[in-house]
Amino acid sequence: MLLLQQKQTEALGTQPIGKLLLRLAAPAVAAQIINLLYNLVDRMYIGHIAPTDTVGRVALTGVGVCLPLIMIISAFAALAGQGAAPRASIYLGKGETDKAEEVLGNATSALVFLSVVLTAVFYIFAEPMLLAFGANDGTGGTDNTLLYGFEYLRLYSLGTLFVLVTLGLNTFISAQGFTVTSMLTVLIGAVCNIILDPIFIFGLDMGVRGAALATILSQAVSMIWILKFLTGKKTTIRIRLRYLKPNWSVLLPSLALGLSPFIMMATESLIAVCFNTSLRKYGVDLAVGAMTILSSVMQFSMLPLQGLTQGAQPIISYNYGAGNADRVRHAFRLQV
């Protein structure tokens, strides 16, 4: 089994680039579509919370105010995960599996540490952050979007560990060339979320808290799937206890490489905050909810590009480590 998995990873340096890019990018695009669709379904359920249409509208707006904060969680996952995964691919290209596993172990520790810090910050300061990010407390005749945003964010923050580890470590599965397995991570979480959403939101009458609980439990299932894979026999590199101890000479270069996607995602969060606060000031709370839906629809245009980038990353990193400059240039040209 191990030999088979090694051959699949080594294919990054031997198979024709065009065929390889298509094989890796197609599952990545599918994963992006699945992720977006289940987010849309999640918001559809929230928008139909009883007893009145107004409640659903205000609840959707309240959750929409939480989205910039959730983007920040994703940004930290990118800082530790997207920065470290390419370095692991480079070491695999060099044939240095132990160093690739050390990168993986340090990234895992960083993700756990960041999740503890973010959980504390989001749980303790949920209310002032939501007010700063565009929520209303119901004074002056406005809708109380803070109530729904607070309920959602406080519960969601308790699952930060599941979200960070899932987002951060799934990149290491793709980095080895196992993009189908990476896609299954997203699919498993999406199916669980779609099943649990109506049960918690409507069946147990939990409202937005039910949506948050469904999300974090789904991410927990995805995290278990990832950890089972990265500690099992089907992976080329494994999470090993001896590499969980932070080594700054390994961790800092990974964080430096992850700084770029972190800044990009943090900037998206800032833009969303600007939209929310401007819409609240010059429009009505309904406009914030409408923007929440519109932003989800707009993401469809980015899916092919994101999938292609995710498919090309392990090819470029692996061949860079192996010293195959021609294959690196070829993959880059095809991607562009």
Positions of predicted regions on the chain:
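Residue-level hotspots within the lipid-embedded alpha helices of multi-pass solute transporters
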Residues: Q32-L36, A75, S115, T119, ...
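Signature of the first transmembrane helix
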Residues: K19-A85, S89, A256-L279
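Helix-terminus/linker motif at the lipid-water interface of multi-pass membrane proteins
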Residues: I33, L37-L60, L130-D143, I199-D205, ...
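Short runs within selected transmembrane alpha-helices of multi-pass transporters and secretion channels
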Residues: A31, G81, Y156-S174, S182-A190, ...
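Structural signal for membrane-spanning alpha-helices in multi-pass inner-membrane proteins
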Residues: F122, T171, D197, I201, ...
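Small-residue-rich hydrophobic transmembrane alpha-helices
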Residues: L60-A120, V163-S182, A290-V336
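Short alpha-helical transmembrane segments in multi-pass integral membrane proteins
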Residues: M1-A28, A88-L161, G203-G258, I316-V336
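Hydrophobic transmembrane alpha-helices of multi-pass small-molecule transporters
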Residues: I72, N193-D197, M223-L227, F300-L303
